[in-house]
């Protein structure tokens, strides 16, 4: 929000009052979730369509207030072609005392990867380009020591030129309830995060990319488990049961005991599972879908894989500036998180207008 306060106007949309700068016109609701509602709008300053998200009850509780601060800090930090970034942030409040609402403005993305998969069978070249961009974005995110945690087709926005942006970081940890049953929230989750095996690392995101890539190649969900146990069985049927070395790393005794009770299964030959796929694609999948997260390929390593030979450019796969996450371990009151958030809103500097805009 720039220092000179713009003129705001109010309107009601879906029983919610929106109070936005005159710069944003023609608001129309496009969706809502637990953490806010989103409208498409026309940005009269740039001539582009944008998404405006109004956070719902951003300071209702300490958890809400910290999540609000986290989301704003993350979005402000992200400056990469393959990652959603912040175009604007504003509040109608004139002072910290009045501050209760936060609005975030990002690119309006036309379709997500779900729409793309459903509509057409993708060529191998399409798959290369899409997965390359996901990994390019992940290399950047991971270099800032951030883990997405929730990569799935609906969190990957794609325009008609096949240009991709990663959306919706796993800001809020999913509740058990959201992970229960036949749900996409879980189908792309690494086993160690789904089953709380151990402290996880950035390669949980690589497992998700493997699941997404397999789906792009076959047109089918790779592990559509009906519940946690069914999902684990589907995973182990493909990658084989864990050996002694991995079992030792699983800190949860109940998880260890359960796995040891299962019949031993060998890893399947991926070439027989992904029949007709480019052998280099199969080789990359074998390196992503590894049960032991310490042995999974990283995003930076995957970008250098031969499968991406026509896209890989080590001089154009940037890393992020360091990201200070020390706030994560802080226990503050609602008003303290609110004050920190207000400072972030006030200090926001918009990206340069001539930046290559991604049209949907």
Curated annotation (Swiss-Prot):
Catalysed transformations (reactions): L-seryl-[protein] + ATP = O-phospho-L-seryl-[protein] + ADP + H(+); L-threonyl-[protein] + ATP = O-phospho-L-threonyl-[protein] + ADP + H(+)
Domain Protein kinase: 24-308
Compartment(s) where it occurs, according to its Swiss-Prot or TrEMBL record: Cytoplasm; Nucleus
Modified residues (Phosphothreonine): 16, 180
Any Gene Ontology biological process: regulation of transcription by RNA polymerase II
Gene Ontology CC terms: cytoplasm; cytosol; glutamatergic synapse; mitochondrion; nuclear speck; nucleoplasm; nucleus; spindle pole
Tissue expr: Macrophages, monocytes, T- and B-lymphocytes. Isoform 2 is specifically expressed in kidney and liver.
N6-acetyllysine carried by residues: 53, 152
Cofactor(s) needed by this chain: Mg(2+)
Regulation: Activated by cell stresses such as DNA damage, heat shock, osmotic shock, anisomycin and sodium arsenite, as well as pro-inflammatory stimuli such as bacterial lipopolysaccharide (LPS) and interleukin-1. Activation occurs through dual phosphorylation of Thr-180 and Tyr-182 by either of two dual specificity kinases, MAP2K3/MKK3 or MAP2K6/MKK6, and potentially also MAP2K4/MKK4, as well as by TAB1-mediated autophosphorylation.
Subunit structure: Component of a signaling complex containing at least AKAP13, PKN1, MAPK14, ZAK and MAP2K3. Within this complex, AKAP13 interacts directly with PKN1, which in turn recruits MAPK14, MAP2K3 and ZAK. Binds to a kinase interaction motif within the protein tyrosine phosphatase, PTPRR. This interaction retains MAPK14 in the cytoplasm and prevents nuclear accumulation. Interacts with SPAG9 and GADD45A. Interacts with CDC25B, CDC25C, DUSP1, DUSP10, DUSP16, NP60, SUPT20H and TAB1. Interacts with casein kinase II subunits CSNK2A1 and CSNK2B. Interacts with PPM1D.
This protein's domain notes: The TXY motif contains the threonine and tyrosine residues whose phosphorylation activates the MAP kinases.
PANTHER family (UniProt xref): MITOGEN-ACTIVATED PROTEIN KINASE
Protein name: Mitogen-activated protein kinase 14
Gene: Mapk14
């Amino acid at each position: 929000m720039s220092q000179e306060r713009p003129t705001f106007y109010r309107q009601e949309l879906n029983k919610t009052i929106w109070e936005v700068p005159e710069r944003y016109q023609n608001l129309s609701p496009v969706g809502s979730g637990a953490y806010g509602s989103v409208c498409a709008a026309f940005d009269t300053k740039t001539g582009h369509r944008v998404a405006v998200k109004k956070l719902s009850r951003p300071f209702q509780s300490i958890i809400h207030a910290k999540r609000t601060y986290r989301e704003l800090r993350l979005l402000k930090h992200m400056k990469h072609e393959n990652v959603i970034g912040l175009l604007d942030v504003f509040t109608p409040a004139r002072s910290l005392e009045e501050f209760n609402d936060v609005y975030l403005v990002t690119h309006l993305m036309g379709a997500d990867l779900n729409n793309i998969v459903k509509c057409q069978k993708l060529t191998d070249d399409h798959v290369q380009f899409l997965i390359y961009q996901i990994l390019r974005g992940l290399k950047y995110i991971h270099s800032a020591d951030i883990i997405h945690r929730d990569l799935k087709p609906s969190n990957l926005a794609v325009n008609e030129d096949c240009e991709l942006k990663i959306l919706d970081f796993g800001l809020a940890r999913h509740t058990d309830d959201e992970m229960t049953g036949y749900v996409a929230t879980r189908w792309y989750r690494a086993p160690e995060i789904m089953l709380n095996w151990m402290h996880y690392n950035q390669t949980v995101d690589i497992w998700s990319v493997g699941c997404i890539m397999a789906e792009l190649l076959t047109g089918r969900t790779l592990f559509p488990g009906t519940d946690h146990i069914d999902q684990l069985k589907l995973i182990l049927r493909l990658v084989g049961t864990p050996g002694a070395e991995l079992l030792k790393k699983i800190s949860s005794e109940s998880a260890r005991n359960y796995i040891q009770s299962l019949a031993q299964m060998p890893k399947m030959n991926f070439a027989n599972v992904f029949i007709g796929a480019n052998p280099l694609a199969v080789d990359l999948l074998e390196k992503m879908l590894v049960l032991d997260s310490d042995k999974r390929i990283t995003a930076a390593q995957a970008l250098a894989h031969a499968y991406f030979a026509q896209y890989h450019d080590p001089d154009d796969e940037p890393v992020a500036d360091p990201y200070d996450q020390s706030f994560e371990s802080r226990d503050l009151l609602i008003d303290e998180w609110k004050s920190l958030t207000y400072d972030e809103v006030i200090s926001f500097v918009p990206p340069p207008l001539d930046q290559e805009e991604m049209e949907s």
